[in-house]
């Protein structure tokens, strides 16, 4: 018999507090991110590139449902959902039946919905569905202890997959082959390869967001993962060099590690994201690269999205205990990125650290260096 989930029960309390706060009669959560959050890591994903899934959560003051169709219902009930949710099933060809059900159980009142968020392409029903309050959005960004345990698992698996793939890579591989090997290693560990960026030797200095091509990687390559498990994203970047990296390239990597350290040093409860951005801008300038901050975003908070909030000069959102972050400072041909979480004592835990990957200490933290294969 299915059991109730303590984490889900707590989240239903938070959702119902949002109902009380706003005077709404229901909350609909359709995005892959919000569905995973509300269900303690369940997935409504079928199409990996979709921002909304094949099921949604509906919560009223009294009840909590998962709404889906006849195609998905049995699998979701058997494999994904706890006993906290009732299941409402509509015919796959009759989407109007679901909307009628929602109107009935919410007494045709105001409904809050995550599809008002900028990340979602679906639009809410005009004059009925409203944006989720900031209080609930904040709760989604702060990890509970049970979420953090799942996050550690995702981060560990993603980092081990990265090490495995780059350790066996060959300079004759195409960028497609390296991206495919990365995706395979993630799938083998039960993680979605939400993003696998690859740049080989020629393209590395040219593009920050290097989507893979059929070109051979040559003497060095960058591999980037945004790996999703339980709805949580582990974000990391690593480099491999076939033979010695060389002094000039090694110096670029040193610069980005030291620039990143300024961001990590500020990741404490109460720090605003714009303060971190400005610290990074200053660090780039001090290292002799004043325009580099304009060439790529620098990262921000992460969690149920690869980036929940991207830091910019005016981002006033503040960090707190339990918020995960992923910064990604870069220069032409060099970048550093891992996923961290702010702990109760204000320190950072690296969720994507692999002790088998080469590293150096930077301001008290072990940070990755390119893997040199001979």
Regions found by a protein language model. Give the residues of each.
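Active-site neighborhoods and metal-handling regions in enzymes and metal-associated proteins
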Residues: 1-374
């Amino acid at each position: 018999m299915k059991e109730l989930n303590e984490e889900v029960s707590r989240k239903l309390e938070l959702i119902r507090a949002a109902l009380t706060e706003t005077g709404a009669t229901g909350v609909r959560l359709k995005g892959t991110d919000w569905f995973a959050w509300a269900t303690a890591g369940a997935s409504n994903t079928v199409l990996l590139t979709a921002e909304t899934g094949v099921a949604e959560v509906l919560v009223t003051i009294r009840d909590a449902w998962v709404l889906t169709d006849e195609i998905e219902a049995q699998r979701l009930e058997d494999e994904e959902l706890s006993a906290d949710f009732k299941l409402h099933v509509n015919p796959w060809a009759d989407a109007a039946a679901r909307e009628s059900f929602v109107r009935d159980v919410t007494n045709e009142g105001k409904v809050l919905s995550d599809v008002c968020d900028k990340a979602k392409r679906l639009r809410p029903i005009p004059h009925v569905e409203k944006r989720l309050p900031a209080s609930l959005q904040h709760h989604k960004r702060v990890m509970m202890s049970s979420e953090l345990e799942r996050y550690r698992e995702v981060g560990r698996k993603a980092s081990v997959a990265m090490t495995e793939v780059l350790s066996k890579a060959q300079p004759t591989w195409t960028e497609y082959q390296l991206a495919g090997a990365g995706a395979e290693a993630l799938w083998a560990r039960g993680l979605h390869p939400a993003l696998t960026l690859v740049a080989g030797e020629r393209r590395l200095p040219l593009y920050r967001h290097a989507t893979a091509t059929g070109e051979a990687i040559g003497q060095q390559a960058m591999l980037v993962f945004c790996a999703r498990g339980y709805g949580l994203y582990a974000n990391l970047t690593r480099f491999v060099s076939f033979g010695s990296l060389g002094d000039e390239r090694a110096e670029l990597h040193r610069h980005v590690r030291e620039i990143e350290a300024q961001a990590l040093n500020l990741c404490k409860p109460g720090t605003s994201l714009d303060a971190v951005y400005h610290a990074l801008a200053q660090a780039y300038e001090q290292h002799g690269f004043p325009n580099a901050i304009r060439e790529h975003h620098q990262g921000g908070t992460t969690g149920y999205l690869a980036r929940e909030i991207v830091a910019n000069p005016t981002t006033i959102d503040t960090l707190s205990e339990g918020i995960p972050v992923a910064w990604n400072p870069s220069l032409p041909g060099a970048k550093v990125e891992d996923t961290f979480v702010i702990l109760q004592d204000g320190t950072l835990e690296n969720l994507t650290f692999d002790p088998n990957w080469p590293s150096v200490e930077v301001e008290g933290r072990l940070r990755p260096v390119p893997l040199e294969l001979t």
